[in-house]
Amino acid sequence: MPKYVVISNHPPNSCPSANAVLRKRGEKLDTDMPPLMQKHSIKPEVMVHLDPGHKVLWVLEAPNAEAVRDMIYESGLSQWNDFEFYMASTLDWINEKIREQPTIW
């Protein structure tokens, strides 16, 4: 199954540590996210906070990019976070693709 890397971030004033409304919403995510990921057939491999910033790194296994996008929207996380979204490949795969391409210099 394809892997996707997502980096989410928010400004300090949108941090659940500082904002009472977002703290309540953030606490709900502990119970809301697992069924939402299951609904979209997403398996989280890594979800870590990048200290001391306001960023989270996600490595997800998902059937397609749309499943990840839809999960983000349905969770409500996009209302207070920005997201960078990447397809992920193994180094073996990318090295094979590199060998298939002619050099340009």
Task: Identify the function of each model-found stretch.
Residues 1-55, 63-71, 89-105:
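Short S/T/G/P-rich N-terminal loop/turn motif that feeds into the first structured element of a domain
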Residues 78-90:
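Conserved short beta-strand edge segments in small beta-sheet-based binding/regulatory domains
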